């Protein structure tokens, strides 16, 4: 399954780039995240509760940054495992300046195995887009909050 998604942040690209790697910002941005830690540089592990139509399970996730080009590109390898099956994805994230802010484009190749394999692609694709959309809306809020808190701390 192929997924493509665009999100326009109301933030400069350098801020999005900086905070896109922050463990706390990411944990607070991931919908239904139960746990999320950076185990080594560019390697994250956690658990996410996913409830989409017939899919209802806790997934153990592993995210690895395979490649990055500061401040415009990430390649991620994502693995998610549950009783319902496994999800393997390679995702490319492109960040570019756009109208004084930042536009992020994701292109992902996803392979689903197990019980979830029989779920229609259009349902899985629609659900994946909704999760990604929520993630980046939350991420933008978390980045703004982190920037505000760091500026507030700097002033005091």
Language model features by range: what are they?
Residues 37-79, 134:
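Glycine-rich portal/gate segments that line the openings of hydrophobic small-molecule binding cavities
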Residues 9, 52-54, 69, 82-84, ...:
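A generic beta-sheet turn/junction motif
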Residues 2-6, 43-45, 60, 73, ...:
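Intrinsic-disorder/low-complexity, polar/charged segments enriched in Ser/Thr/Lys/Arg/Asp/Glu/Gln
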Residues 7, 34, 60-67, 78, ...:
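Hydrophobic/aromatic beta-strand elements that line small-molecule binding cavities or substrate pockets
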Residues 1-43, 47-49:
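Hydrophobic ligand-binding cavity/cleft-lining segments
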């Amino acid at each position: 399954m192929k997924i493509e998604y665009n999100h326009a942040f109301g933030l400069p690209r350098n801020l999005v780039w900086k905070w896109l790697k922050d463990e706390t910002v990411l944990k607070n941005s991931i919908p239904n995240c139960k746990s999320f830690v950076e185990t080594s540089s560019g390697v994250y592990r956690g658990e996410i509760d996913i409830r989409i139509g017939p899919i209802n399970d806790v997934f153990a996730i592993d995210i690895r940054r395979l490649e990055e080009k500061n401040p415009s590109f990430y390649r991620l390898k994502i693995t998610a495992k549950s009783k319902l099956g496994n999800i393997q994805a390679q995702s490319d994230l492109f960040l570019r300046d756009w109208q004084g802010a930042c536009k992020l484009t994701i292109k992902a190749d996803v392979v689903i195995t197990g019980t979830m394999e029989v779920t229609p692609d259009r349902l899985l694709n629609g659900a994946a887009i909704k999760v990604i959309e929520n993630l980046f809306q939350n991420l933008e809020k978390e980045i703004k909050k982190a920037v505000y808190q760091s500026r507030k701390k700097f002033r005091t």
